Amino acid sequence: MPTDQELIKIVPSSRQLAYQATEFYAFFHFGMNTYTNREWGDGTETPQIFNPTEFVADQWVSAAQNAGMKGVILTCKHHDGFCLWPTRYTSHSVVSSPWKNGRGDVVWEVSEACRRYGMKFGIYLSPWDRNKPCYGSGKEYDDYYLAQLTELLTGYGDIFSVWLDGACGEGPNGKKQIYDWKRYYECVRKYQPDACICVCGPDIRWCGNEAGDVRKSEWSVVPARTALAESVQERSQQTDDKEFRMRRITSDMEDLGSRRALEGETNLIWYPAEVNTSIRPCLLYTSDAADDLI
């Protein structure tokens, strides 16, 4: 069992400390699915569907700030593969939409609103892409994903969070991708060294559910094996499953950081938990539940 002296040597990095000081921040789920009344898209949606008429980034960010939040994370691309910025690597993006005649950039507008309001800005870029034909090909798809990740990390100012989802289903070719997490991490460290890599990453741990529920004691000092992206991926949501979204912590779920749990562990890390939950029944807005709040 680790001694007290060994335990107190496990401390947060500067980026982790800054992240934890953020405390409370918004996770904006917005994209193609907002206009299809679906939680998850399948990648076959036409960009012509995407045409926001009342999108005002300043209103979003100011509302978050008025709620006491200190930052914003935006779903720049969800599993359907539709990109909210004019990426150079696919036409399945705002460029092919009627919104602003194909000249709009949701990521830029939200990131700039964050600068104006003194709020931190973070990105969500789903590794799963149900639109891209090369998904499941290995290095070819990883190169594509990294090219888009680089665009976001280099074109939108300081990034405080890179939220890496563990969902890994089939692409349009019926294949699954083995994500090259190591290359993804290296890309983030290269272009945004102060950003925390979250969930399937080494900096911030996911609490394990979308119901906003945590263990009675959610320790930050945990075994290093807890940060293996592959194990996090296995426990992540893999289908559009309402039951998964409402799953809560139960007494038989793994104890991660108590003295008993750390007994016999030789490699410990600082890996604080993050909790995310929706104010609506689903993560995205749907017209049939427009007035429903949890």
Model-derived features with residue positions:
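Mature catalytic domains of secreted/periplasmic carbohydrate-active enzymes
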Residues: 1-290
